[in-house]
Amino acid sequence: MRKCRTIALVFLISFLINLPGFGQKISKEELLFLTPNWTGERFEDGRPKVADEILDRMKEVTHEEAWAVLKNEGYKYQYAENWETIHSDRVLVGRALTATFMPGRPDIHDAIDKRGKAEGKRGQNSWPVDLLMPRDVYVANQFGLHIGGPTIGDNVGNAIYAKSGNGIVYDGAVRDINGLKAIDGFVSFFSSYHPSHHNQAGDLNTMLIGINQPTQIRQVTVMAGDVVLGRDGAVTFIPPHLAEKVVITSEVVRLRDMFGHSRLREGVYTAGQIDTRWSPEIEKDFSQWLNNHKNDLPIPKEQIEEILRERTW
């Protein structure tokens, strides 16, 4: 595992050195270049801005539903599991703002720090936080660092929540865990907890190498603007151009399940008929059921009408 991390870091350093804005925020041109499939609205810096309405509907999506859509589209490595959590009974949804940290190296750290301070910035751990927008999720690769790793405690956590209204996905250790738990709405996924903090005196162990660059979270490559879906102890990162498809597919699955369960309770169909590919007669019955109940179902009426328009039976 350590060898794999080392190789990944070497490749990432080589990649970042050849990108504009190395060490800090990705350029707008590079962000546009790396997200060509997104044709919708963007933030001023070029980051894809998936609509709030899609984010609202995403809160009902399960990992299974998202995984199936992404796998069918060729995105097989978008799911990361086995996290420590804060407010584990809630769902985290938002647009990814990414930060990449690497093990500290004085010459590179000092060059980055000098440039940042010339722009009026302070500690590197606050630079990504300053860029957060409402409904963002701060997604940080802290390379799993535990002892001496935390760049987020209750002060930074409160700043993150004040700007985004969301929590974090943080591949590393956090500190001040009780203070973070006290932030209502700070739904978060992180690797571990430790009472220490990063870059203690005489121990430059971490540095910020990129903001909104492609970053690695476990086995996932995460891009700025991805939709973050965190629930049930795991996180799925959904490319922005697939977010609406994930939501619509999830809604159709839920409606079909509701219809199937209803008809089974009524004794209209057998389990064998519902558990296999539906016959044209059942599909027609489903469409009629949608039309009859569209004002009562837990899916927006407008979405049900759109589903009905697209059906051919």
Predicted regions and their residues:
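Boundary at the C-terminal end of the N-terminal hydrophobic targeting segment
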Residues: 21-23
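Buried hydrophobic positions in well-ordered alpha/beta secondary-structure cores of metabolic enzymes
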Residues: 46, 160, 226-228
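Feature captures the catalytic cores and cofactor-binding loops of soluble hydro-lyases/lyases
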Residues: 57-65, 69-224, 237-283, 291-313
